[in-house]
Every structure is written in structure tokens, then in C-alpha cells.
Amino acid sequence: MIFYILFFFGIIKSQENYSYQKPPPEILELVDITLPPRVLIDENKNFMIYLYRNSYKSIDELSSPEIKLAGLRLNPNSNSRSRTNYYNNILISKMDQIDKSAKQIKGLPKNPKLANIKWSPDQTKIAMTNTKEEGVELWYIDLEKLTAKKLTGPKLNASLGDVITWYQDSKNILTKFKLKNSPDIIDGVDVVPTGPIISSNDGKKAQNRTYQDLLKNEVDEKNFETLARSVLSKVSLKGKTKLLAKKNLYHEIDFSPDGKFILISIIQKPFSYLVPYYRFPMKYAIYSSKGKELTVLHEVPLIEDLPKGFMAVRTGPRNFSWRSDRPSNLIFVEALDGGNPETDIKYRDEIFEVGYPFKQNKVSLLKTINRFYRIDWCNDTLALGYDYWWNSRNTKTYIFSPSNTNKEPKIIIDRNYQDRYNDPGSFVKRRNFYGKSILAMNKQNLYLMGDGFRDDGQFPFIDQLNLESLKKVRLYESSFKDKKEDLLDFEADNNMILTRIESASEYPNYFFRDLKTDSLTKITDFENPFLSIMDVSKEVIEYKRSDGIDLSATLYLPKGYDINKKQKLPMIMWAYPREFKDNKSASQITQNKNEFTFPYWGSPIYWLTRGYVVLDDVSFPIIGEGDNQPNDNFRKQLVDNASSAINRVYELGYIDKEKVAIGGHSYGAFMVANLLSHSKLFAAGIARSGAYNRTLTPFGFQSEERNYWEAPDTYYNMSPFMHAEKVKTPLLLIHGEEDNNSGTYPLQSERYFNALKGLGATTRLVMLPKESHSYRAKESIMHMLWEQDRWLERYVKNK
């Protein structure tokens, strides 16, 4: 009887049932706010669009019908993505008028759920979708008239790829529609099996990541076809609809710059149970603007067996796209190394151009030493090509002449893309006659906008690059030391910069900066909604690891903290490990103390209101120079990063060293579990949505491209699950029940919790219903904050 009572109460204690809870008022005040809108500005700076949405979804919204197919999550009732973020209001400001105040759009739907916002080519209109329970509607807004109009009923198919695409005339929209007589969705639970599910392999190596939400059986295949199949129709702004192309599994849709042709990708069979839909067989074809198929460019087979490595690609033509500075010239890439990164060859990729009829007389434009990345077009005599190689972190920029293939391309930038201090920036673009993005060139000059990270701070800049001498002249460099400036656009013709400026306590606002007069014109006036943390202390601290690597972090002290008395407070650290191939890049400071203090849903900043010191964005580099792999020395570097950070804040006199917590999300959660397994630095840990057993991700994870059988010791040593018996520190595990991130499926937290519990650790597992890898519902987020606060109060502050 005594055994029964103890057993019964053991079950009660181990399995608690709670309704959704709310965090303390100090935290709740920062969560329950309305954020300023997202801002869009047209190329000519005539219109500013304010897009409003709720800060969070509700658990009711998140509980809408959902079916998981081929890597997608779809709402079968509305035939759309089930986890889309929607806007609920739109305001417009006409920036070329005296009255620049934001005006309400007339005629918007009731209780709008707006998405797929698309500028028209002439940038006087925007198209969008409105999602209702029974389907998705097509709407558009006339920006001059400030009016919205519904063009179709709830007939669109918004499940896959491009849903709406403007015609070049800005008067018609190419739209995906549901089939009129589409089959009903099959409920697989009630289907009687006709046989086993069989997967086989003919001896080829097929090493794939642990993708989720894949097809599992024939019922899934049929449901995928039902929800993904659509017809293409032309919809005029008067609401007239004309069928353009018959039913198919249309994916991506892209008009040629002159609007005469359409590049379309179409998913084919056979489907796969191993990889998501975007690696299914795919047909690339050219259609006329009237919907006639003209040319099949290439039929890509099922991609299940790529060579090993992050730089592996398939063979055959890939990366089909239109050349943005020409009417209808098609670009594609082919691997010269068979797609295999281990092949030793001078050039990895070759880029080709082909014109109508798109099947003959292809012209080679460029060969890249690394894997092709993209091309920025300008004109017949100038384009910039980019490549990159993950293993060395190298990227190159090539200048070449598209019309003169005899002219040797020249490498003008050759750098480590993780080296932020020497980042030359990105080339400025502009819209051309076709409404496409091309390089902004003025009198043989191009322009670069850079973030401007240096060892003494962040100072964004604009450089002018002369194409003949390849010499640079600095046109502008931010001089702010008490604010953060982000350069968004530059018009060389009138020396005008569109910029965004913020400070730790000032919400980001948009400005025009006139370089001629060195003046600023404010164009938005958003206020800080987080008043309770407006006056907290914030600084970027610098310190060294035991091996001499320079580290940094953002340190926050609670409002009213007396810097002279230096009361020793509890601290919460939050971090995310990152891999580097050189010490120099790993040591660079990329935090900015003037960045606006924004407590997003997963932030530790909330605990400033609860009397904690917060150390956020803590440097956690994992370095492997030369032939050394970063992860082969993962644990030692991890502990060294953590102890160095704690010691620095302790030396400053702010914290009780015995009352420090560590937290992280995803790979940061993996970090937390490892630190609690291999150090005694912390009073408690919070690990959200992590992976803890690397044998369950045997073909690579994060930045590890070796498989388990190539590096078994590394996989074992890095897996907290294998060292669960060492955890003596209280650990709070939180996970979304519907996590679809590769490698972090909920089983990871469930099995790790069971191991910790079985070994006598102090631990708690919170599974959030309906949540994926990032949490969306307000109820879930509030409960998460409540759980974290209780954990910190019990095991850290009141230790």
C-alpha cells in the first residue's frame, strides 16, 4: 500500500497539468504591447507603406487545421501555408506631397489576413492575398487613390512557391488557382493499408539531413498532389479571369524582363519519402505570356544522392534565371566538378547565357573557382559574378563583360566572408527600364554600402569604386558614437541616402540624408514601446579567452543600478556557438551598444526588470584553423568561452559568481546542455528546442559536414545525451511539440529528459502544443516566460 501511494504521487509530480500561465507584471508589460509597423518604400521614394500586424498569433490561430506534406505545413481548408504571418492593416504615406501623414486605405476586407505583398512593375500599386477560412482571395491597392479592391473570391492556391506575379504592364496578375473539382483530402487514419511501406537503395550513397514533415505513404502523396496542384490564370485589375495554363504542380514563376516569356518550374514524379518537395524531380520550361509552353529547358531527376559535403550540387543545368539588364536572355549554371566538392579542379562552375528559342547556341560567360553564388547585372559590358566556398570561408567577386567573352574576367574581391572588419560592403542597385534590379553605375563608378564594423565600433560607409583604376573614394562614413545607423539605399545622382537610425533607447526610424548639405530629414516617428527598460545600462564588454582569443558580449545592468556600490546580482547569459576557420575573424566585435534594446519573444532582456544582470549575444566561437575541424575541440572551447565571460563580469564587480544561469535556443540549447555536462560554472540552465543526441543526426548537423561514421568520437563527445550522468545543475527543457527544424525534432528533448530523470538530475520538460521551432502563440510565449522566471527565481536568485 505504501509503495502504491509513493508510486501514485511520483506520477503526479512527474506529469503536471497546467493551463497557460502568465509571467510576472514586470515581464508581462514588455510582452503585451503593440509594435510599430513594418515599412516599405518604393524605388522613386514616392510612397511609404506601413504594414501592421499583431505581435503574436493566438493559440486558437495556431490550432487551425494543418497537414504536413513533403516538408510543407498546409491548411487544407484554405489551401495555403498554415503558419504564414499576416498583416491586418495597411496605411500609405505620399512622400511627394506636403501632407506626408499616413492615410488609411479604403475598402480593405473586414478582419484582414494579408500576405504575399507584391509591388507592381510601375510601383503605383501593390497586389496581395487575403486569407479566409474557406480560401485565399486576390486583392490589389491603388497607391494614388488609396483604395483596395478584391479581384477574386477565395479561389487561389497559396500552397507552393509564387502565388501571384505581376505582368509587365502592371494591369494584370498571373495567379495560381485551385482546381474547381479538386479531390477531397484523404484522412490517412481511416484508410485500410493495402501493403507495407518499402524503401530501397541500389547501392548508391544517399546522405541526407534529418528532414521533417516528409511524405510517408501513398495517402500523403495523393494529398500533396491535391493541395499543390493548380492552374495558372491571368487576372485583370477589373477582376476578369482568363485561364492561362492547365493543371500542374507549378512551383516558381518568373517573367522575363520584357514580359514576353515566363520561366516556370513544375514538380514531377516520382515523389520521395527521404527529401522535401524542392528536391523532387523538377521540370524547367519557358512559356509565352499567353500560357503556351514553348521550350522544356531541363528535367531534373529526383535528388536523393548528392555527393558528400555542403558544397555538393547536382549535375546538369541549374540556377535558371533571367538576365535583368536584357529583354529575355536566360542564364544557367553547370558544375564542372561533377557537383563533387572533393574533385580537384581549377574551376567549379560555368555560367552560360542563351537567348530565344532557349535551347541552342549557349554562350559561356564566366567560370568560377569556387561554387557559383549569383550575378549582379549592369549592361552589355559590365557584370559582377560571385562565388563562395564554405570549407575555406572564401568568396570572390569577378568583374566581366557579358558581350565580350574573349575578355578575361578579373577578380576584384577575394576575401574571407566571416571577416567583418574587412568587408567591402554590397554594391548599390537601382531599378532599370524593365523594373529589375541592376548595378547603379555613374560615369564608370560603382558604389558600395558597408556595415563598417571596426575594433572601435560600427561606422557604416559608402565607397565609390572607379572601374578603370579600381580605386575607392569614401563618400560617406557614419560618425555616430551614441546611435546606430543602417544605410538602406543610395542615389548617386542626387547624393541622397535612405537610412535608419536608432539608439539603445530610441526605436529605429527612417531618414533621408543629403550628402550635399550634410542634413537629415526624418520620415517616420516611431516611439519606443518598451518604456520600462528605456534607461537600463548597456555596454559592449571585451575580454580574452585563455588561449588569447578576443571575445565580447553585450552587458545590461538593471534600471537604477548603482555603479558605485556594485551590488552583486544574479546573472543570466544567453549565447549561440558559431564556427570559424581563423582566429582573426572569430575575435572581431560585431555587437553594437547603440542597437535598440528590443525584447523579442526569446530574449533574456526581460529579466532586467526582475533584478538580474543580463549578458546577451556572448561570443562563443568554435575555431578550427587549417586542416583542423572546429568541432574536434568543441567542448574545451565551449567551457573556455563561458568561464571567460563570467570571470570578466565578476571582475567588474556586478555579479555573484555562484548565481549565474545559462540559456540558449536551438544550437544554443545544445550549448547549454554541453556546458552543464562538462562544467560547474552555472547555477541553472534553460535549453529551448535543442538537439542532444547527435547519433540521431548521423549525416551532419549545424556546420559539421562529416557523417557519424567518419567522426564517431566527435559525435559522441559533442552529444549531451551521452554524458547525461554528469549533469548536476538544474536544467529546464522547453520544446515546441510540432518542431519541424532539421535535427531538433521533439523526440530529442523527450529522450534527453528521460535520461536526466532516470539518472536523478533536477530537470523539467515543457512541451508547447502546436508550436514549431520558433514559438508563435501569445499564450505559449507567456507560459514560456513564466516557466523561465520560476526556474531562475528558484535555482538562481534564491539559491
Task: Locate each region found by the language model.
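Active-site glycine-rich loops that stabilize anionic/oxyanionic intermediates
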Residues: 576-581, 592
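Active-site-proximal cap/loop segments of hydrolase catalytic domains
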Residues: 86-91, 588-799
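Beta-propeller folds
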Residues: 4, 14-518, 525-535, 550, ...
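Conserved hydrophobic/aromatic pocket- or pore-lining residues that grip, position, or stack substrates
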Residues: 284, 330, 412, 510, ...
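Bacterial Sec-dependent N-terminal signal peptides
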Residues: 1-16, 737
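N-terminal cap/lid segment of alpha/beta-hydrolase-fold proteins
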Residues: 524-567
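Short beta-strand element of the alpha/beta-hydrolase
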Residues: 566-578
